[in-house]
Curated annotation (Swiss-Prot):
Name assigned to this protein: Protein phosphatase CheZ
Chief location of this protein within or outside the cell: cytoplasm
GO molecular function: phosphoprotein phosphatase activity
Polar residues compositional bias, start-end: 184-193
GN (gene name): cheZ
Stored SUPFAM superfamilies: Chemotaxis phosphatase CheZ (SSF75708)
Observed effect of gene inactivation: Cells lacking this gene display a strong clockwise motor bias; in combination with a yhjH disruption and overexpression of ycgR, cells switch from clockwise to a counterclockwise bias.
Coiled coil: none
Record family assignment: Belongs to the CheZ family.
GO BP of this protein: archaeal or bacterial-type flagellum-dependent cell motility; chemotaxis; regulation of chemotaxis
Amino acid sequence: MMQPSIKPADEGSAGDIIARIGSLTRMLRDSLRELGLDQAIAEAAEAIPDARDRLDYVVQMTAQAAERALNSVEASQPHQDAMEKEAKALTQRWDEWFDNPIELSDARELVTDTRQFLRDVPGHTSFTNAQLLDIMMAQDFQDLTGQVIKRMMDVIQEIERQLLMVLLENIPEQSARPKRENESLLNGPQVDTSKAGVVASQDQVDDLLDSLGF
């Protein structure tokens, strides 16, 4: 491939500096095109905004689910508090009646209040059950966000793979041995760490970058 010559820039010449940067940029683009990596890098770059949008979606869905759950809890709390308060009051009145039996008229009032409380309980519990169901339904975001997060991880791994490919295809001669040792990176990490020479994928990446001086 014919590469454009890069002329030394005069120290004070902005035009020469711009020309040099332009030549370097053109040389890089031509090299990527010759290696067949220009499209892969472009696809990886396009995936970054998509991943950001997906992450925003996960945040929004999580926030909506949290808000629904909190609203349901806040709506249920008064019903639970009312039942608790009334139950304690009735229990105290019945305990006092057993300790010191009261007049028939007072006893009738106690029975009437107790019956009213029992009639009100199903309404409170029905409302609370509906709120609990809404809390449970709010958790369905996990299925959707789980799929989105998995897709984002695939995108991140693909970007890393493409960047590693560029490095491995363009490292200098003195780095040939580290290149051979790290060629397995392009096939993804090996899970069986019990095998000799196998390390975690991130460690492999770090070793490669260290060997290249990054």
